[in-house]
Design a protein with these regions (language model features):
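Hydrophobic, well-ordered secondary-structure elements that form the walls
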Residues: 193, 223, 254, 274, ...
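Active-site-proximal helix-loop-helix substrate-binding element of RNase H-like nuclease domains
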Residues: 1-51
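Catalytic nucleotidyl-transfer cores of nucleotide-processing enzymes
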Residues: 7, 111-230, 322-335, 339, ...
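Common nucleic-acid-contacting/processivity interface regions adjacent to the catalytic cores
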Residues: 33-142, 146-149, 208-252, 256-260, ...
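C-terminal, non-catalytic extensions of nucleic-acid polymerases
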Residues: 289-536
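Catalytic palm subdomain of template-directed nucleic-acid polymerases
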Residues: 276-293
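Catalytic palm active-site di-aspartate
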Residues: 193, 265-279
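Generic non-transmembrane alpha-helical segments
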Residues: 19, 253-264, 290-302
Length: 536
């Protein structure tokens, strides 16, 4: 359930409200023995309701069905799939293939990674801060599996005199001389997935379509599992050269595409391991889609498929790696924002924080600067006045165990877990603990556990939450010259159309205008920190 939903609160009551819109029966676990003596039927009803909710959640989310799909692909029992890690999926297929090919299988072992053992990761083409228009996103289909197949990368083909030379220096035998186990397995999985997807298109039965869709998704998960385990430091077949070779080929691919596009005057505003974001020279839907399809066909070669995944209009980033937000307008128009890397996606952010950030992004994409400022100021004012429900301020974090940290007495999740146990609730190491900060001025800060369905009778530290909101919002609005102090004062008058800020969009003059340094365009206003008292 944690893998599927990543909910901010993991109690049965909280997940039931999130998924089913229903809650547990109101029985205090601390007085369960008394309830059993006085009202046995109610306790029985309570237990039946708990079991019913848990089963319905599993069926609604599809956890069991997804486990069965992965079990089918990996040839494992469902129980093993649901409780094991990804290396078990890879092991099941790879050990079978090794046994049938007469290849020895190492005993599993664990080794602590050393700093100099870490392989270089994928390439990231940093995005400069700004608002971009008509952004084409091209994404490699199954990039790592395709690279492994194309270059015959495997522990069985790694040799000093191989014909295939990785950018990292490792050499592999050509498939004509020796076909690797890993490329053979991945080729079979890729063909299996293509066959399933063809059957999906052919069927008119919704139930069969749903089943096949789950199956092809499971094949994709298993395919991508192999790079992960070979790039790790614990897998039985791990060799540093293999993981390094895969990422080296990936970096070469992506940087080559970026160089080609930019030499032709097509600005690439962002790129990562397997995708590139290009500013379209056409400023309309039809023209941008045509350009995107052309580039997709052009760079799909040598067994690699570069798909035209989506078109965004507009897209915003404040310049941090892997953090952006945009509106998808193709292949289908989406009402929801696509958000990557910001607090909206983090399970330890509180709901009001996520909600305000989502609304703030919407106004930024609409170039509504006055609305953005008003939103932040009004939200902070409401928090300081205590006009927000406690459940909007809940912070959650996983707790490994009560003695799993060096300074447990300073950890908010430990403090909340202990108080939760005092209230009669069970604690299981690894579970997510939820709390509300009641006094941030102390060291450590004081927190109280929040239990879904149980009234919260303490007073939150509203000043603490207001400060967090201003700090979070300022990281976004500083792109436009609005600092944390400006947000608290509400006095900054910059707009998206002032000379201090030029949205990074393609113009008729040509791409060279887009490429001007953002540092020359954005002047961040410096000011002293302003207290919340001064704000009011």
């Amino acid at each position: 359930m944690k893998k599927e939903l990543r909910p901010k609160q993991e109690t049965l009551n909280a997940v039931s409200k999130l998924i089913l819109g229903e809650e547990k029966l109101d029985v205090d676990p601390k007085h369960m023995d008394d309830e059993w003596k006085n009202n046995r039927a109610r306790v029985i009803e309570y237990c039946i309701q708990d079991a019913n909710l848990a089963l319905r959640i599993l069926l609604t989310v599809g956890t069991i069905r997804k486990g069965m799909d992965l079990a089918t692909v990996s040839k494992l029992p469902v129980e093993d799939v649901l409780v094991s890690g990804t290396s078990t999926l890879a092991d099941s297929l790879l050990i079978r293939a090794a046994d049938r090919s007469g290849v020895g299988v190492p005993m599993s072992g664990k080794r602590k990674a050393q700093r100099d053992d870490q392989i270089a990761g994928g390439y990231v083409h940093t995005m400069k801060p700004g608002l971009y228009h008509w952004v084409i996103v091209l994404d490699f289909k199954s990039m790592y599996p395709s690279l492994i197949i194309a270059n015959n990368i495997c522990f069985t083909t790694l040799c000093e005199d191989g014909d295939i030379v990785s950018p990292s220096g490792a050499r592999y035998a050509s498939p004509e001389k020796k076909r690797g186990l890993l490329p053979t397995i991945l080729s079979g999985l890729m063909a299996q997935r293509d066959s399933i997807k063809r059957n999906m298109k052919a069927t008119e039965d919704p139930a069969e379509h749903s089943y096949l869709d789950g199956l092809q998704a499971a094949v994709k998960i298993v395919m991508n599992t192999f790079y992960g385990v070979f790039a790790s430091d614990f897998y039985r077949f791990t060799d540093k050269s293999i993981g390094a070779s895969i990422t080296a080929f990936a970096r070469k691919n992506i940087t080559g595409i970026i160089d080609s596009l930019e030499k032709e005057g097509h600005p690439v505003i962002y790129g990562d391991t397997d995708s590139v974001f290009i500013l379209s020279p056409k400023h309309d839907l039809e023209g941008a889609v045509e350009f995107g399809k052309t580039q997709s066909e052009r760079f799909s070669k040598n067994g690699m498929t570069l798909e035209f995944e989506k078109l965004m209009e507009p897209l915003f980033s404040h310049g941090m790696k892997k953090r952006y937000v945009g509106r998808i307008v193709w292949p289908e128009k989406h009402d929801d924002l696509l958000v990557r890397g910001y607090e909206i996606r983090r399970s330890d952010s509180f709901d009001l924080q996520s909600r305000m950030l989502t609304e703030l992004f919407g106004k930024i994409l609409d170039e509504d600067n006055e609305g953005a400022l008003a939103l932040v100021k009004d939200t902070i004012r409401d928090v300081m006045a205590g006009k927000v429900p406690p459940e909007d301020l809940v912070i959650s974090r996983t707790c490994k165990g009560l003695d799993a940290y060096e300074n447990p007495e300073r950890m908010a999740n430990i403090q909340a877990a202990k108080k939760m146990m005092d209230m009669g609730y069970n604690f299981i190491p690894g579970m997510k603990i939820s709390w509300i900060v009641t006094d941030a001025s102390t060291a450590p800060q004081e927190v109280e556990p929040f239990i879904s369905g149980v009234p919260f009778n303490k007073k939150p530290d509203y000043r603490y939450y207001a400060g967090r909101l201003a700090q979070m919002a300022s990281r976004i609005t500083e792109v436009f010259g609005w600092t944390e102090a400006d947000l608290l004062l509400g006095s900054q008058q910059k707009t998206l159309f002032d000379d201090d800020f030029i949205p990074l969009r393609p113009k008729k003059e040509g791409p060279e205008d887009v490429k001007k340094s953002t540092d020359e365009k954005i002047q961040k206003k410096k000011s002293k920190t302003v207290s919340l008292d001064q704000f009011f």
